[in-house]
Amino acid sequence: MSETSQTIPELVSWAREREFSLSLNTERLSYLLAIALYNNERFDGEMQESDLVDIFRHVSKEFDQSDNITTRANNAINDLVKQRFINRFSSEFTDGLSIYRLTPLGVGVSDYYIRQREFSALRLSVQLAIVADEIQRASESAEEAVRRGEDEYYWRRNVFAPLKYSVAEIFDSIDLSQRIMDENQQSIKEEIAELLTKDWQAAIASCERLLDETSGNLRELQDTLNAAGDKLQAQLLRIQDCVMGRNELYFIDQLIVDLQSKLDRIISWGQQAIDLWIGYDRHVHKFIRTAIDMDKNRVFSQRLRQSIHHYFDAPWFLWTAQAERLVDLRDEELTLRDEDALGELPEALEYEQLSDLHDQIVEAMQALLINHREHNQPIDLSLVLKQQLDNYPLSRHFDVARVIVDQAVRLGMASADLSGVYSQWHEINDYGAEVQANVIDEYK
């Protein structure tokens, strides 16, 4: 534990002495946020009691509570003062009127709900650029201190202080923003679930938009993190090399370890969030496909019959491959006994099972990949996938890609994975599918 941190008993004693007791219901939280927004528009950061009463009146109007405004406003103000969200000041210079200012606690709570909600790739890039500059200056100062034999005061001011009070705080801000994005993803999942529960047919387009937007945002943020992560780690290692073996600078070495852990956690969060979201994306699409398969003989046929009935009011076009099956729409309860109406499976596919198809793909891919191994040729999965997927229909792309990746990782591994180098995303078909994999160049 670094010397600037506090122990658990110290923090417990500090909180106990000040008798902290926080309780914010929806109305009180809304009132605090409204105060924070109003305070941001004032140059002096000070508010009078009449201002707080007017703000409370607007909040109460939104909650449809317009009675006893003054009394309830005074109670709310006293409650926020008691919980130390705002401070009250009064003196002879204010003619007996009290002035109010937000406390650090009030600023922190309101800032979390207002400004921290915006987390974009642009903001992340700016934060990482600031961090890179601070670490660069700190590393140069550390190397200069080693050459000139500077004392501990120099190390604290030019190396420790920027890392502790600038870099670490920005890392904490990014970490907090990522946790907020976790909440946003959960709210999007709830929104998708609600859409699918109410009317999944009308919700398919909205679900696709939400899924694509979230996937794109996560991938863009992760690309930004990957681009800066290695450079930041390298700069931290430069500083760590400068303090290695110097026991009097233990506090800097401990801080470097903490920063490296935070940076690793920030970068790994992005990839983990993408993996989890991809799994959820597949789950939603599987649900939609299942719902369509189960529903096609009920709601779909009913909607089509309604469209036919109202054709002259709303004309439409219908393309069909087997027009004779339209007779099935005459009666929803019709028992289909005619074998011709159901159609027959082509003889070439009649006895083809999924396992047989899988075995065929495995044999073909093994023959392809073993050839690379025998000639000690590196396997570029993105290139192999793109070449092979061109030979298969879209419906089999997922199975083929899964088999290729599975067989490739059994043959060898990528040396770039051991050095922590992230590969770029490469397209593997004409439908937007991408893969991120280093070249396999070491065989087992």
Curated annotation (Swiss-Prot):
Pfam families: KicB (PF03882), MukF_C (PF17193), MukF_M (PF17192). InterPro entries: Chromosome_partition_MukF (IPR005582), MukF_C (IPR033441), MukF_C_sf (IPR038198), MukF_M (IPR033440), MukF_M_sp (IPR036141), MukF_WHTH (IPR033439), WH-like_DNA-bd_sf (IPR036388), WH_DNA-bd_sf (IPR036390). Residues 211-239 are annotated as: Leucine-zipper. GO terms for molecular function: calcium ion binding. GO terms for biological process: cell division; chromosome condensation; chromosome segregation; DNA replication. Involved in chromosome condensation, segregation and cell cycle progression. May participate in facilitating chromosome segregation by condensation DNA from both sides of a centrally located replisome during cell division. Not required for mini-F plasmid partitioning. Probably acts via its interaction with MukB and MukE. Overexpression results in anucleate cells. It has a calcium binding activity. Belongs to the MukF family. Interacts, and probably forms a ternary complex, with MukE and MukB via its C-terminal region. The complex formation is stimulated by calcium or magnesium. It is required for an interaction between MukE and MukB. This is Chromosome partition protein MukF. The lineage of its organism: Bacteria, Pseudomonadati, Pseudomonadota, Gammaproteobacteria, Pasteurellales. The gene is mukF.
